[in-house]
Regions:
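Cap/lid segment of the alpha/beta-hydrolase catalytic domain
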Residues: 403-519, 526
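Bacterial N-terminal signal peptides
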Residues: 8-20
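Active-site-proximal cap/loop segments of hydrolase catalytic domains
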Residues: 468, 474, 482-712
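Predominantly five- to eight-bladed beta-propeller fold
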Residues: 65-69, 159-238, 399-405, 462-468
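Structural motif
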Residues: 61-68, 118-123, 163-170, 220-224, ...
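Multi-bladed beta-propeller domains
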Residues: 24-37, 71-97, 125-143, 226-263, ...
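Beta-strand C-termini and the immediately following turn/loop, strongest in propeller blades
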Residues: 51-58, 99-105, 110-117, 155-161, ...
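Non-catalytic accessory segments flanking enzyme active sites
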Residues: 221-222, 349-441, 466-470, 474-475, ...
Length: 712
C-alpha cells in the first residue's frame, strides 16, 4: 500500500471519528450509568504506593464490578489491578460501602473485605499484582477488619452465620411471619430486598429514620483473632486488643458525629493516639482533638475554616501532629483541603477545587483523601468532570493527575457546567450547576429541566442518578441542579416552600437572560428532591412535566408506617406537623397529593423502588382515572436508590424520553419505543381536550420551536 493511500485511509478514519464525536453532543445515559467510581484510598507504609478500589456498573451483565488497584505515588507507572471479581457491599438505602484496605507493615499486601460467591470474607492481594487469596473462611459474613501493628494477626467481627440467618428466615416463613413494629409493611414480608448479595428478610432498626437491616442484624457481634502464619483463630480476649489499637472503634466521644453513608468523623493519630472529631451543635460544627478520648478535655481548631465550612473528611498526617481536613463552601460551590497543626494552632489552605475533594459524588460524606507525609492522594470530581485521582503536595499545593479512568466520558463531555448563584424574594442565597442546551440558535429559548437536592461531585443524574443532566442538555434541554438549602428548623413544609421560591427565582433569572422558555420547565428528583418537585407541582403553575423517584406522604404511608410506634409518630409531627389524618386533617390537606388531586394536572412520571411504591397508591390510582397524564413503573427488590444497572439505565432513558416528549414534542423514531409513544400521545390528546373543555390553554407555548434540539 502506498504512503498516499495509507494517509487517505488514516484521514478517513480521523474524519469518521470526528464526525462521531460531533454527533455525540454529550454522554449518553448508558455512559453515565457506567461511570467508573474510585474510593477507599490507602497509602502504603513506605509511602511509595496508593491502593484504591474501582467500581463500575455493567448494563450488559446487570452487575457491578469492583477491583483493587495499586499505583506508585510518583505516577511512574499506571495502576496495577491486584484483585478483581469482587461485588460491592451495600449499606442503608443501597449506598455502596467504602473502606480503605489495611496495608501490611512491609507494604507487600493489602487486606480488604470482599463479597465473592455470596460470602463476605477477608481477602488479601499482593501489591505487585502477582496473586490474591482468601484469608478468612468464616461461616458468617465479616463486618469489619483490623490488622495488628506487627502485621502478624488479623482481627475481624462477625454476626450470626449465613446458615443461621437463612434458616431463621425460612422457619419464620414456614410458620407465618408475625407482624411486629420492626417488620416493614407495604412490601413483601419474605426476602423482599438484597442484603449482602442475596434476597433476604429485612427489619427496621433503631439506628435512623426508616433504616432497615437483615433479620438478625441486631444480634451480638463476635470479634475473632486470626494468626496469619498458622491460620489458627480464637475469640478475642482483652489482652489481644492493644495489638489492634490503631484500627479498633473509638469509644468515649459521644459528641462526635457519623455522617449517613460515610466514614466515621473520628480518626485516631498513629503518633500518640490522639483523636480528631467533629462536634456538631444546632447550627454549627467544630473540629476538635482529644489527647485522651476518655476525658472531656478538647483542643478546638481556632480557624474560621474549621467552623464556617461544612466539614467533609478528616485524616492525620503520618508521624506529625497535623490533621488534614476537607471543608465545603456552599456559597461558592468549592471544597478546600486544609492542614491544621495542633501544636501551633495554625491552619493552612492547601488547595481548593470547584467540586468534590475526596470522592466522586456527594453521597459519601466522610470519604477522605489518603494522606502521606508530604502529600495526599484524592479522588477529584466536579459537575462535568468525572472521578479521577490527583496528588496534592502539602508544601506547594501543586496538583498532578495520577489516574484518569473515565476517558470516554471526558471525550464526550458535552455542554460545560456553569456555577450559578441567585437569591429569591426573601434574600435567600441559592446555588446550582447549569448545563446550557446544545444546538440552540441565537435568540432561541430552550426548555429547562430542574433537579433540586444535592449537586456535589460528578453530576451523572442528580441524587439517585436517574435524570441524565448532560444527556438532556445535549438533546437541547437546559439542565439545572439546584443545591438544596439547609433544612428549615421550623419543619419540612418550610423547606418545601423554600424550594418553590428558589426554583421560581431560578426560572425567572434564566428567562430574563433569554436562555430558557419559562412555559417549558420540567422537574424531577429522589427523596427530598421528589417531595420538592411534587410540592412545586401542587403549589404553582411553573412546571410542564414532572418525574419523581420517591412517593411523598399519604394516608397509606401513615397507616403502614405508624406501627413502628411513638418514635415514627413523633418525628412525623415534628418535621411535617402531621398526626393521623383524623387528628390533623388540615395539615394533611395542605401537604399530601392524595388530598390535592385537582392540583396535579401536570404530566407526571413515577419510577419507584418496590419497597416504597405502595405510598403512592392514594394518588396514582385517582390520577390514572383522571385526564392528567401519569405512568408508574416499579423496580423489583429496589430499596430507596435504584441499584441494578439495568434499572438505572431504564429510569434514565425513560426520563430523557419523557422530558423530550413533553418539553420538545419530540418522538424517538426507534421502533422499539413505538408503543410507549402511542400511549403518551393518547394521554396527551386526552389531557389537551380536557384542558380545552375546562377553558384552559391546553398546550404549552411552542413558539420557540422545540428549544433547539438537534434532530437525528
Amino acid at each position: 500500500m502506498s504512503n498516499r493511500l495509507i494517509h487517505l485511509v488514516l484521514l478517513a478514519h480521523c474524519l469518521m471519528l470526528l464526525s462521531s464525536l460531533q454527533a455525540r453532543a454529550a454522554p449518553s445515559p448508558k455512559m453515565l450509568v457506567e461511570t467508573i467510581d474510585l474510593s477507599s484510598l490507602a497509602i502504603s507504609p513506605d509511602g511509595l504506593n496508593v491502593a484504591f478500589r474501582q467500581d463500575q456498573a455493567s448494563v450488559e451483565r446487570n452487575a457491578f464490578a469492583a477491583g483493587w488497584y495499586v499505583q506508585p505515588l510518583d505516577g511512574a507507572h499506571p495502576p496495577v489491578r491486584v484483585a478483581d471479581g469482587v461485588e460491592p457491599v451495600r449499606m442503608i438505602y443501597g449506598l455502596v460501602a467504602t473502606a480503605p484496605p489495611k496495608w501490611s507493615p512491609d507494604s507487600r499486601w493489602i487486606y480488604y473485605r470482599a463479597m465473592v460467591g455470596g460470602e463476605i470474607q477477608v481477602w488479601r492481594a499482593a501489591a505487585d499484582g502477582s496473586r490474591a487469596e482468601q484469608v478468612t473462611h468464616d461461616a458468617a459474613d465479616v463486618e469489619s477488619i483490623a490488622l495488628s501493628l506487627d502485621g502478624r494477626q488479623l482481627s475481624y467481627t462477625v454476626g450470626p452465620s449465613r446458615e443461621t440467618i437463612e434458616r431463621s428466615e425460612q422457619e419464620e416463613a414456614d410458620r407465618g411471619i408475625r407482624i411486629t413494629p420492626n417488620v416493614p409493611l407495604g412490601e413483601e414480608v419474605f426476602r423482599p430486598g438484597v442484603v449482602n448479595g442475596r434476597l433476604a428478610d429485612e427489619r427496621y432498626t433503631d439506628k435512623g429514620w426508616m433504616e432497615q437491616a437483615g433479620l438478625l442484624a441486631g444480634q451480638p457481634k463476635r470479634r475473632i483473632v486470626l494468626d496469619l502464619a498458622s491460620g489458627a483463630t480464637h475469640e478475642a480476649r482483652p489482652e489481644d486488643l492493644p495489638a489492634f489499637s490503631q484500627d479498633l472503634p473509638i469509644e468515649g466521644l459521644k459528641a462526635s458525629s457519623t455522617p449517613a453513608g460515610g466514614n466515621d468523623f473520628r480518626v485516631r493519630s498513629g503518633l500518640d493516639g490522639s483523636v480528631a472529631f467533629v462536634e456538631r451543635g444546632a447550627s454549627t460544627s467544630t473540629l476538635r482533638v482529644a489527647r485522651d478520648p476518655t476525658k472531656s478535655s478538647f483542643i478546638a481548631c481556632p480557624a474560621a475554616a474549621c467552623k464556617d465550612a461544612v466539614l467533609r473528611s478528616l485524616a492525620w498526617r503520618p508521624d506529625r501532629d497535623d490533621v488534614v481536613f476537607t471543608g465545603a463552601d456552599r456559597s461558592s460551590g468549592r471544597q478546600s483541603l486544609y492542614d491544621w497543626n495542633i501544636t501551633s494552632g495554625s491552619v493552612k489552605l492547601i488547595t481548593s477545587e470547584a467540586g468534590v475533594i475526596g470522592g466522586g459524588r456527594g453521597l459519601m460524606t466522610g470519604e477522605s483523601c489518603a494522606v502521606a507525609a508530604q502529600s495526599a492522594v484524592c479522588v477529584m470530581a466536579s459537575a462535568d468532570v468525572p472521578p479521577h485521582l490527583e496528588t496534592v503536595d502539602f508544601a506547594t499545593g501543586q496538583r498532578h493527575l495520577l489516574y484518569e479512568p473515565n476517558t470516554t466520558l471526558i471525550a464526550a463531555r458535552g455542554p460545560r457546567a456553569q456555577f450559578l448563584t441567585w437569591t429569591d424574594d426573601h434574600g435567600r442565597l441559592f446555588t446550582g450547576q447549569y448545563f446550557p442546551a446544545a444546538g440552540g440558535k441565537p435568540g432561541q429559548r430552550a426548555p429547562l429541566f430542574i433537579n433540586y437536592y444535592s449537586c456535589d461531585g460528578y453530576l451523572r443524574g442528580g441524587l439517585g442518578d436517574e435524570w441524565p443532566l448532560a444527556s438532556l442538555a445535549g438533546a437541547g434541554i437546559a439542565s439545572l441542579c439546584i443545591q438544596a438549602r439547609p433544612n428549615d428548623p421550623s419543619g419540612q413544609i418550610a423547606s418545601y416552600e423554600t424550594a418553590l421560591s428558589g426554583v421560581g427565582a431560578a426560572v425567572d433569572l434564566l428567562a430574563s437572560r433569554g436562555l430558557v422558555d419559562p412555559s417549558r420547565v420540567g422537574m424531577g428528583g429522589l427523596s427530598f428532591g421528589s417531595e420538592a418537585a411534587q410540592w412545586v407541582m401542587m403549589r404553582s403553575n411553573r412546571l410542564a412535566a414532572v418525574s419523581v423517584a420517591t412517593p411523598t406522604l399519604t394516608p397509606t404511608y401513615y397507616l403502614t408506617q405508624s406501627l413502628q410506634g411513638a418514635g415514627f409518630k413523633a418525628n412525623l409531627l415534628k418535621e411535617w406537623g402531621l398526626g393521623s389524618p383524623s387528628e390533623t386533617p388540615e395539615a394533611w390537606k395542605r401537604l399530601s397529593p392524595a388530598f390535592n388531586i385537582d392540583k396535579l394536572q401536570t404530566p407526571i412520571l413515577m419510577q419507584f423502588a418496590e419497597q416504597e411504591y405502595f405510598a403512592a397508591w392514594d394518588y396514582f390510582v385517582p390520577l390514572s382515572e383522571s385526564s392528567t397524564p401519569v405512568e408508574l413503573y416499579v423496580f423489583p427488590h429496589e430499596p430507596h436508590l435504584q441499584i441494578e444497572p439495568r434499572h438505572q439505565l431504564a429510569a434514565n432513558d425513560r426520563n430523557l424520553d419523557w422530558f423530550r416528549f413533553w418539553l420538545q414534542d419530540y418522538v424517538d423514531p426507534d421502533p422499539e419505543k413505538a408503543e410507549q409513544y402511542h400511549r403518551w400521545e393518547t394521554m396527551k390528546a386526552r389531557w389537551v381536550a380536557a384542558r380545552h373543555q375546562a377553558g384552559q390553554d391546553g398546550s404549552r407555548s411552542r413558539e420557540h420551536g422545540g428549544g433547539g434540539a438537534p434532530q437525528p
